[in-house]
Amino acid sequence: MDLVNHLNDKLLFAIPKKGRLYEKSVSILKGSDIKFHRSARLDIAISTNMPVALIFLPAADIPMFVGEGRCDLGITGVDQVRESEVDVNLPIDLQFGTCKLQVQVPVAGEYTSPEQLIGKTIVSSFVNLTKKYFAQLEGVPESEMVTRVKYVGGSVEASCALGVADAIVDLVESGETMRAAGLTAIATVLDTSAHLIESKNPKGDVELLRTIKSRIEGVMTAQKYVSCSYNAPENKLPELLKITPGRRAPTISQINDSGWVAVSSMIERKNKGDIMDDLKKNGAEDIMVFEISNCRV
């Protein structure tokens, strides 16, 4: 990472280097109009339109780089932040990579509650979070806990079947891998998702930092909302505005038709079908929904 030491005029943004987190992160960058080209063999890419350097790192390493102020911003999971035990800001939930860090035991086994695992052997790649969880369960400091926690970097779900562990603590998204391994969850240690994380001692330009955060907030809002427009009879406007109150307030415009107005409002994407149906039932006409490619809120 010696090259980073020579990028003093750039804001350093740590990005997961592979997998679904990488793909989703790149989508966020594109939506934020941070343009770049990444060479196949390099883990650093310079933005072509902003004074930003993208540093591609394993997701588990990003909290350390941001926490130590080596990078100004990063994208990684809350699980990685908590496991790393670093002090960073988490300004934006990016709403992908959503999963649970759970205590899992064999389906056909004797354990049905985490309390039964006190004094047993637990395997996880999240050793710090696992120790903290079981120390709290035992009501003692970590140095005095009797539960044994072992680190395994991958294929954690095989540990019980191989006799290495009585239980595991691992991430669960859909649960398919867990069920395929003959495991079931009996407790949740942490709910997690990908977040934008920010150094508490950024070295990059503070105004640029604010701009990037604002752009990413705009991308997230555009993903959550759509724009809904319709024509409304003035005598039914109060009821229709209850259906589409907007983020702050709807926009109401006069049209060249006596007794009618045009209404435009932001509505949640997930509810757009029901909202359009309700508008129609309450007298609205010419109801249209438009995508929001980006915005500032």
From Swiss-Prot:
Catalytic activity: 1-(5-phospho-beta-D-ribosyl)-ATP + diphosphate = 5-phospho-alpha-D-ribose 1-diphosphate + ATP
Gene3D superfamilies, per the entry: 3.30.70.120, Periplasmic binding protein-like II
UniProt-annotated location(s): Cytoplasm
Gene Ontology MF, one: ATP phosphoribosyltransferase activity
Keywords: Amino-acid biosynthesis, ATP-binding, Cytoplasm, Glycosyltransferase, Histidine biosynthesis, Nucleotide-binding, Transferase
GO cellular component, one term: cytoplasm
Assigned EC number: 2.4.2.17
Class in the EC hierarchy, top level: transferase
Record-linked InterPro entries: ATP-PRT_HisG_long, ATP_PRibTrfase_cat, ATP_PRibTrfase_CS, ATP_PRibTrfase_HisG, HisG_C, N-reg_PII-like_a/b, N-reg_PII/ATP_PRibTrfase_C
Keyword Signal: no
Residue runs in coiled coils: none
GO biological process: L-histidine biosynthetic process
UniProt xrefs under PROSITE patterns: ATP_P_PHORIBOSYLTR (PS01316)
SUPFAM superfamilies the record matches: GlnB-like, Periplasmic binding protein-like II
Residues that span the membrane, as ranges: none
Pathways involved: Amino-acid biosynthesis; L-histidine biosynthesis; L-histidine from 5-phospho-alpha-D-ribose 1-diphosphate: step 1/9
Similarity field: Belongs to the ATP phosphoribosyltransferase family.
Function of the protein: Catalyzes the condensation of ATP and 5-phosphoribose 1-diphosphate to form N'-(5'-phosphoribosyl)-ATP (PR-ATP). Has a crucial role in the pathway because the rate of histidine biosynthesis seems to be controlled primarily by regulation of the enzymatic activity.
Name of protein: ATP phosphoribosyltransferase
Source species taxonomy: Eukaryota, Fungi, Dikarya, Ascomycota, Saccharomycotina
